[in-house]
Amino acid sequence: MMSDTLRAVLLGIVEGVTEFLPVSSTGHLLLAERFFGLGEDGFWKSFAILIQLGAILAIVALYFFKLSRVAIGALTNPDDRRFIIGVLIAFLPAVIIGLIAGKYIKALLFDPWVVCFSLIVGGAILLWVDQIDLKPREHDATRYPLMMYLWIGVAQCLAMIPGVSRSGSTIVAAMLLGGDKRSAAEFSFFLAIPTMVGAFVYDFYKSRAEMTSDHLGLIAIGFVVSFITAMIVVKAFLGYVTRHGFVLFAWWRVIVGTLGLIALALGK
């Protein structure tokens, strides 16, 4: 029988690998939880959200100097101030939709069947966007037009449906709006910071009374594993998509979604 410590390590790896790839970390974690037999266990559902902070801190570490430059530059540089405003504008739609409909979305859509269908549909869209002849106009994620930030934020709301992928929806939106592949991926990383920190704080507050010392130890393990894994994956991901695009990730989504549907149909 699998120990809780091993589950925490494996889920931390799944989170770290999938969080910033356009494959849906939430979808993969839900399928992994089902595979591990965690069912409706409230702690493990919260665990999947809480360990996202490890992946987020990996982005902060990797982009520390760039983010610090922007933060300091915002005092005197209007372009840096504008970027910070742009991130907040992109973050706002998710806050509004999350507060209004978050609990209904979780109740109605957090289902393995929804995850699998979303993985397949999202994979087809990602494949289409990667193949069409887009003409990038924007090559610096910190200098996108303000309306572009807003529409990327609106697209991020689609990721509240498990299996859609937060990074996938924001990357696709940025590319359709004129961003190149690298800057689209980078802005998706930057937008993840306020979005996922907000989700972490909200879920930790809701589940704080149920946490035990054993739970905190498991969360710490998942946190560290997701941090290390995300550090490795993000550096490799940027170089890969710049050279090869998103075809690999699109097909991965389609294959995982299809296998998931087959397993569900067979009652696995």
UniProtKB/Swiss-Prot annotation:
Top-tier EC class: hydrolase
Keyword terms, alphabetized: Antibiotic resistance, Cell inner membrane, Cell membrane, Cell shape, Cell wall biogenesis/degradation, Hydrolase, Membrane, Peptidoglycan synthesis, Transmembrane, Transmembrane helix
Subcellular compartments: Cell inner membrane
GO cellular component: plasma membrane
Reaction equation(s) it catalyzes: di-trans,octa-cis-undecaprenyl diphosphate + H2O = di-trans,octa-cis-undecaprenyl phosphate + phosphate + H(+)
Membrane topology listed for this record: Multi-pass membrane protein
Top-level lineage group: Bacteria
GO annotation terms (biological process): cell wall organization; peptidoglycan biosynthetic process; regulation of cell shape; response to antibiotic
Further comment found in the protein's record: Bacitracin is thought to be involved in the inhibition of peptidoglycan synthesis by sequestering undecaprenyl diphosphate, thereby reducing the pool of lipid carrier available.
Function: Catalyzes the dephosphorylation of undecaprenyl diphosphate (UPP). Confers resistance to bacitracin.
PANTHER family in alphabetical order: UNDECAPRENYL-DIPHOSPHATASE
Protein name, entry field: Undecaprenyl-diphosphatase
